Amino acid sequence: QALLGNPKILILDEPTAGLDPKERISIRNYIAELSKDKIILFATHVVSDIECIADKVLLLKSGEIIATGTPVELIESMAGKVGEITCTLDEVGELQKEYKIGNIRQRKNGLALRVVGDELPEEAVKVGDNIDLEDVYLYYFE
């Protein structure tokens, strides 16, 4: 129904929320196709939607724009602010009190914690080119 009358601007709120991965991909591809001749504004918490569709991103917090740029620009702005630390399960709680922690993955030698922030633990290995929009989200919103 949103496309009746061929509008030049589409406003979508969480267009892929609750969809299984296959349907999410289908909807994202459709939105990307529509964006060739329309302005599309969409609100989402699904970071992969942004990575696949957006050519410009506005991050809003309490109604204020806190960051803006292309996905690549936002990712590049995180250089030096994302690291990974290997620790034990017992150490996770303390690290979560001091740092913004992203994904926690099981590794052979313990747990790998993604750490995001202006200051990283000394033992953190900076991830370099392995930064994504999820890191940007954690930096600004967690």
Regions found by a protein language model. Give the residues of each.
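Conserved catalytic motifs of ABC-family nucleotide-binding domains
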Residues: 6
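Residue-level recognition of hydrophobic positions within alpha-helical transmembrane segments
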Residues: 19, 45-47, 130-131
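Helix N-cap at the start of a conserved alpha-helix in ABC-type nucleotide-binding domains
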Residues: 21-23
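Conserved mid-core alpha-helix of short-chain dehydrogenase/reductase
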Residues: 26
